[in-house]
Amino acid sequence: MTFREVMEDYFKSWGLSVRESTSISHKKSFLYQCKELLDLNIKDIKKETIENHLAEMLSRLAQSTVGHWNARCKSILEYAYNNGYIESDFYKNIVHIKIKNAYAISVITENQFQQLIKIAKVQTRHTDLEEKILFLELLFKTGLRHSEAKALQVYKINFDSNEIRVNQSLYCDIKGKWELAPTKTPCSNRTIKIDKNIAQKLKDFIELKHKNRDDFLFSYEDGSPRTTVFAKDLLKKSANLLGVKISAHGLRHSHATMLIRNLVPIQLVQKRLGHADPALTIATYTHLISDDEKIIVDLLEKIW
């Protein structure tokens, strides 16, 4: 059995847990960097085989690119081992290539967000300005992923209990073709509370637009949901004028940061964000948790 055949089996298996477009793009990216390995018998591939290939890749590619490829290769070899295609788990000892964080996602404070919205409100050249501002406010005040916010339909908002049901994500390609898909993980299916202020804004918006219960909350005149670029330019322009860097995903991080800064228990933050495990929340916001340790130290010093 060749490495290519094992790889094909792996991606078929892995593809069951992710969107088809994700599986295709990851497979294409991996294939592009391993043509020399594809026709080798899987049993002839050793630790040295992979590490020599990694060394060659490092001579011409960015470390992060090689790191991602290496991680995928190890997953494929682990799949081969678990399915009896190879007899050794040598992949565990393959050199680790650190994946550098190419960029840190910026966050903004509540005060900065309020200033950003004030700036956004005077950007009158933008079409559907009020809808875009509401979209940004929803992201900041709920921590929703932008794909989850775009998938919201009117009936998923309960104004009696001020809750939003999150059970789908909306993905769109560069040509504008969109699809509704399950949320990122099963744990991302959740119901979250919203404050009275944002609830009233949502209610007023729905009444103003005469939306039916099955309509997408954020949509074009023909009823189709807003695409990937929706509100992106407005956010970028307003952030630049304010002198900060922030993305739609950064608004989600800003929401989580606000909760942690106000000492909301990490388990509640995890559930609100739809993380599968508290460990993921801790890993993502470990710098904030470390800073909060200073609060404990300050308290102890005052006591003693």
Descriptions of predicted regions:
Residues 40, 63, 120-129, 142, ...:
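Short, basic (Lys/Arg/His-rich) helix/loop patches that form interaction surfaces
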Residues 43, 86-88, 99-119, 174-195, ...:
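DNA breakage-rejoining catalytic core of tyrosine-based enzymes
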Residues 151-204:
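Conserved tyrosine-mediated DNA breakage-rejoining catalytic core shared by Y-recombinases
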Residues 175-181, 283-304:
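DNA/chromatin major-groove-contacting recognition/catalytic segments
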Residues 82, 86, 93-152, 160:
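Basic, Lys/Arg- and aromatic-enriched nucleic-acid-binding interface segment
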Residues 54, 71, 139-140, 260-261:
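Short amphipathic helical patch at the helix-1/turn junction of helix-turn-helix
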